[in-house]
Amino acid sequence: MKYDHLLVRYGELTLKGSNRKKFVNQLRNNVNKSLKGLDGFVVKGKRDRMYIELEDHADINEITYRLSKIFGIKSISPVLKVEKTIEAISAAAIKFAQQFEENSTFKIDVKRADKNFPMDTYELQRELGGAVLKHFDNISVNVKRPDHEIRVEVRLDAIYMYEEVVPGSGGLPVGTGGKTLLMLSGGIDSPVAGMEVMRRGVTIEAIHFHSPPFTSDQAKEKVIELTRILAERVGPIKLHIVPFTELQKQVNKVVHPRYTMTSTRRMMMRVADKLVHQIGALAIVNGENLGQVASQTLHSMYAINNVTSTPVLRPLLTYDKEEIIIKSKEIGTFETSIQPFEDCCTIFTPKNPVTEPNFDKVVQYESVFDFEEMINRAVENIETLEITSDYKTIKEQQTNQLINDFL
C-alpha cells in the first residue's frame, strides 16, 4: 500500500485548553528537529491532529520510527487521504482489502467528525463493507475479532483511511515544562530518570563527575553514549563533565570513612547547584531510589539535600529495581549502563557507609578544609559537550579516520 500521509495523534496536550497552541507549536518544532536529514515530507500541525504529507520518495518507515520516539505523540498511522465521495471511499476500501490474506476476516470502523457528511456512521460502514464483499468472495466480516480493521475518519477537509496504529511515546512535548539538570552517573538508574522527566515535557542538560585517573576514558565515553541515546528522542543535549578528582581525594583524606559517601554527594550537589544557576535550570534530577543503597535512605537524602535550596526531583524514588531495569531496556540504555567501567560513585566506596548520617558530624568533617575554593575550580574547568543523536566519541572518530586512511 502506498500511503500519502501520516496521521499523528497527540498525547496529553489535547487536555491543555487555552495553552494547546503553545504545546502544538513546540511539538511541531520537535518533529521537524527529529526528522532533520530526511526529505520528501511536509509537517502540518493542527489543533487536534498533525498531518505529515508524504511525497513518493519519502522513507515512511524511518519517519514513522522517529515520530514514535517523540514525547507528546500518542500514536501514528500511515493513511490514505480520500475525497469525500462514496465512490472514492469505496475504491480505497477495496484497495486496502486487496492486501488481505485469503479467507481472512475484516471490519469497517468509522469515526465521523464531520456531522454534515450525508451518511451516518452505520450507513457508511454498511456501504463500505458491502463494496468490499461484492469485490472479493474469499474474505468475510467479523466485527468482534477481525484479522483486519479498515479505519475511516470523516474529517472536515477529507476522508482519512488506515489500518495500522503505531504506538507513540505519549507524555508532553519536550520544551513545554522548563529546564532541569540531570545528574548522570553512568549506571542504570539516572538515564531512566532523565527519560522520565523528559516525558513530562522537561528539557534536560546533564552533569557527570569524572575523576581521572581513578575513572577511565571508557567511563566517560559510556556517559557520552548514554547521553546520545537520550538525544535520539529530543535532539541535542548538553553534557557538562566536571573534573572531580581534587574534591574526591580531599574528601577521602579528611572525612571519616563512614561519612565519605555522604560528603562526596554533598560536594556533587554543591557543584550541580552552581551549574543550575549558570544554565538557567529550575531543578536538579537524579536517579535515586529510596532505600536502594546507603546514600539513598531518607536520612542520607536529608543530609545531602541540605546544601542546596534548588528542588531535587527523583522520578524513580519508589520504583522497584526490576521496574527500572525493564524501563532501561525499553529506552535502550541498559546494555550501555552495565558496561563494567567504574564511575566516581563506585570508587573509594567505604566498606560500611553510614545509612543514618549525623548532620552535625558531616558538617564538622567538612569544616576542616576549604571545599568552596575547590568547588569553584571544578565549576570553572567543566568541559561541555553538545551531544547529538549521531555524535561520535574521539575514539570512534580516530577509528573511522584510520579506516578511511587504509581505504
From Swiss-Prot:
Metabolic or biological pathway: Cofactor biosynthesis; thiamine diphosphate biosynthesis
Cellular location(s): Cytoplasm
InterPro entries: Rossmann-like_a/b/a_fold (IPR014729), ThiI_AANH (IPR020536), ThiI_fer (IPR054173), ThiI_N (IPR049961), THUMP_dom (IPR004114), THUMP_ThiI (IPR049962), tRNA_STrfase (IPR003720), tRNA_sulfurtransferase_ThiI (IPR050102)
EC number: 2.8.1.4
Any GO MF annotation of the entry: tRNA-uracil-4 sulfurtransferase activity
Catalytic activity: [ThiI sulfur-carrier protein]-S-sulfanyl-L-cysteine + a uridine in tRNA + 2 reduced [2Fe-2S]-[ferredoxin] + ATP + H(+) = [ThiI sulfur-carrier protein]-L-cysteine + a 4-thiouridine in tRNA + 2 oxidized [2Fe-2S]-[ferredoxin] + AMP + diphosphate; [ThiS sulfur-carrier protein]-C-terminal Gly-Gly-AMP + S-sulfanyl-L-cysteinyl-[cysteine desulfurase] + AH2 = [ThiS sulfur-carrier protein]-C-terminal-Gly-aminoethanethioate + L-cysteinyl-[cysteine desulfurase] + A + AMP + 2 H(+)
A Pfam family assignment: THUMP
Described function: Catalyzes the ATP-dependent transfer of a sulfur to tRNA to produce 4-thiouridine in position 8 of tRNAs, which functions as a near-UV photosensor. Also catalyzes the transfer of sulfur to the sulfur carrier protein ThiS, forming ThiS-thiocarboxylate. This is a step in the synthesis of thiazole, in the thiamine biosynthesis pathway. The sulfur is donated as persulfide by IscS.
PANTHER family named in the record: TRNA SULFURTRANSFERASE
Protein name, entry field: Probable tRNA sulfurtransferase
